[in-house]
Amino acid sequence: MSSYFVNSFSGRYPNGPDYQLLNYGTSSSAMNASYRDSGTMHSGSYGYNYNGMDLSVNRSTSTGHFGAVGDNSRVFQSPAPETRFRQPSSCSLASPEPLPCSNSESLGPKGSSPPSDQSTTTAGNNLNSNTHFTEIDEASASSETEEASHRANNSAPRTQQKQETTATSTTSATSDGQAPQIFPWMRKLHISHDMTGPDGKRARTAYTRYQTLELEKEFHFNRYLTRRRRIEIAHALCLSERQIKIWFQNRRMKWKKDNKLKSMSLATAGSAFQP
């Protein structure tokens, strides 16, 4: 082996002769001889025995590092049993008893009553607890019935209130459905809401100075409006799209008429200056 492993092993376990290293080149007899017998070792100085388990190193005489399965008697039992750390426990894994260990009596408190007395006392305690639970159950059942009746009495006016609220909500919904939705451009504050004149015809739309100025500005840049721009102007000026469309149609007709008159006047003026 390497010197590093040897040094670490000797540093970890100061008793070097007690823990001889395993030589893999020798035979099985030599390997068995290289270990110390577990009977000659002191369990108090090399390991602690808790619940019968041997926690020391190299206690078995088998070839394995932790010991073979067949040598459990030498591995798990110490020749010098210590009553301070463990009790002699002999547990049978195949027995169906609830407490198979032989030292089950040591688990309970010392100086207690016999098992028959314990069983009678536990039965009496269980009987008392059962009667107490039945009393509690009866009291809780009576309280639950009272609460249920109280809830039923309270639920009746609540249902009536809910029915009234639903009826009022339905009536309000029907009234809202009958009334049309009002948009800002539908509110014509500058004109009368009755759109009929004295002779039964539609009244002429009266535009304010602000509305006329904004429409003239828009017509100066664009003589034809897109639907998007028309909706924007309608919301800004509190007018309807139809009103803006009609205004632009009338303004285009006026512009054509003015240009026609201007062109005619220019033509007549030009013809007048001809020789």
From Swiss-Prot:
Which stretches does UniProt call biased (Low complexity)?
165-175
UniProt record, GO biological process:
anterior/posterior pattern specification; brain development; cell fate specification; regulation of transcription by RNA polymerase II
Coiled-coil segments? none
Summarize the protein's role: Sequence-specific transcription factor which is part of a developmental regulatory system that provides cells with specific positional identities on the anterior-posterior axis.
Output the superkingdom of the source species.
Eukaryota
- Identify the coding gene: hoxb5a
Region annotated Disordered sits at: 70-181
List the stretches of this chain annotated as a DNA-binding region. 200-259
State the SMART domains in the record.
HOX
Q: Where is this motif: Antp-type hexapeptide?
A: 182-187
* Entry similarity comment: Belongs to the Antp homeobox family.
- Is Protein biosynthesis one of the keywords UniProt gives this record? no
GO cellular component entries:
nucleus
Protein's name in the database: Homeobox protein Hox-B5a
Species per Swiss-Prot/TrEMBL record: Danio rerio (Zebrafish)
Q: Name one Pfam family in it.
A: Homeodomain
Q: Where is the composition biased (Polar residues)?
A: 113-133, 151-164
Its keywords, alphabetically, are:
Developmental protein, DNA-binding, Homeobox, Nucleus, Transcription, Transcription regulation
Which GO molecular function, any one, fits this protein according to its record? DNA-binding transcription factor activity, RNA polymerase II-specific
Looking up PANTHER family in the UniProt record yields: HOMEOBOX PROTEIN HOX (PTHR45659), HOMEOBOX PROTEIN HOX-B5 (PTHR45659:SF2)
Quote the subcellular location field of this record.
Answer: Nucleus
Residue ranges of the TM segments: none
PROSITE patterns listed in its UniProt record? ANTENNAPEDIA, HOMEOBOX_1, HOMEOBOX_2
